[in-house]
A protein has these predicted regions:
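Claisen-condensing/thiolase-fold acyl-transfer catalytic domains that form or cleave C-C bonds
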Residues: 1, 87-144
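Active-site/ligand-binding loops adjacent to catalytic centers
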Residues: 5-104, 148-202
Length: 203
């Protein structure tokens, strides 16, 4: 909607290619757009547990509006597609983004997973610029990140942690030691412990 308005106002001249992203556990929009136009019939789905809980909707009431906007976008010359990703890909992408300082929630991870899948499918070239929609903070769904680090996902999610991405939380200074130290001593002890963990001591 916003891109169509910007084009009408002359702010932009070309419409970028757009992709929606859905999990395999909640994918009614992907199922609709994965078919040729003449064969498309919208059907709701029964959702399965998803880490992207805000998008875990099997029968979105907004679908008629989505379809109307997509139709208008394509008539105006824009391209639209939908990518489907696994729960594993969503969590791996969430952790990957967070490891690089882009603090995202699982819906943001779903968005990045979609970009990676689109590249894998050849729908986005390696040198192309992409803008991802990620508007929530990691703290909103921090429990899923902790499950990833501690390998405690229930089996219905289908998520197994990638050891290379795992960053399990650990105490820097235990509670008993903290209680014994003054504020200044605690600060020094914590800083020293962090430096040692990061192998920065003595550098």
């Amino acid at each position: 909607s916003g891109l169509l308005k910007m084009r009408r106002l002359g702010i932009i001249s070309d419409l970028p290619r757009l992709f929606g992203v859905q999990s395999e556990h909640a994918d009614p929009v992907w199922r609709y757009y994965s078919k040729p136009k003449a064969e498309r019939v919208y059907n709701p789905v029964t959702v399965r547990p998803s880490v992207a809980q805000a998008a875990m909707i099997g029968n979105p009431v907004s679908f008629p509006r989505v379809k109307a906007l997509v139709d208008a976008y394509e008539v105006a010359g824009g391209e639209f597609g939908v990518v489907r990703v696994t729960e594993q890909a969503i969590m791996d992408a969430t952790i990957l983004a967070n490891r690089h300082g882009h603090i995202v929630c699982t819906q943001g991870g779903e968005c990045l997973a979609g970009l990676l899948k689109a590249r894998e499918e050849g729908r986005v070239a390696a040198g192309e610029k992409a803008v991802l929609d990620s508007t929530a903070h990691a703290l909103k769904f921090a429990g899923f990140q902790n499950m990833y680090f501690t390998d405690t996902f229930p089996p219905e999610y289908g998520v197994a942690p990638d050891a290379s991405l795992a960053n399990r939380p650990s105490l820097v200074v235990d509670a008993a030691e903290k209680a014994r130290l003054s504020a200044e001593e605690f600060t020094r002890a914590a800083a020293k412990a962090v430096a040692e963990r990061l192998e920065l001591a003595g550098k």
